[in-house]
Amino acid sequence: MRPSGAPYGEVLSFTRLENRVLSLGGGAAEPVLDAGGRLLVLYAALRSVQANLTVYAMPSQKPAFLTSLLTTLDELKSYCITGEQLTQVGEETEGMDGEKLRDLGLIFGAYEAMTARGALDPRDRLTRLAEKLRRFPFFQGQDVYLDGFTDFTPQQGLVLAELLRQAHSVTLALTYGEGAGEEAVFAPARKT
């Protein structure tokens, strides 16, 4: 008979889940960049590809510009978009939009290469968690309950795919309103 009840349950956010899995499966001791470190690595990445850039060839050295660029890279990471993909789309797109995408792809690619050789970017945590779960059966035979979400990013989807693959059962509770249109507050849950 399988154990059941509160003494055997854990309440984990995605971040706490990553910490738990890495502490059990290895990898928790890897260094992670803080906010300042991320800005410095991004600046170094930008400088390393500056000669190949068109739109961002003469970038502002102000922290606000780098912070804005880092916010863009964070969004791309959450949607599992790589620098290589951006560069390719940029080369296929004409005009200023294509040049911007190409430049962003080059910068992003350089940033990824630098973080791969040194400290981990914290925005890679979910991707790293999904990769670890492919090799470490943390959810094997477990009953999992998800609550408090209205939708999931593709990066979270990678983790959920591994959870679904391993778990005995998965129950997902979504807040949902009847009869509301696509613009309503519950529209993201409806699409999930």
Regions of interest found by a model, annotated:
Residues M1-F138, A187:
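Basic/charged alpha-beta structural segments of nucleotide/phosphate-handling enzymes
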Residues L17, T150-D151, G177-G179:
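Short, solvent-exposed loop/turn segments at secondary-structure junctions
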Residues M96-D97, V144-Y145, E178:
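A short, structure-level motif marking secondary-structure boundaries and short turns
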Residues L126, T150, V159:
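Active-site and donor-binding regions of nucleotide-sugar-utilizing enzymes
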Residues F136-G141, L164-R165:
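Flexible, charged surface loops at secondary-structure boundaries
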Residues F139-F152:
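Conserved P-loop NTPase "ATPase switch" module shared by AAA+ and STAND
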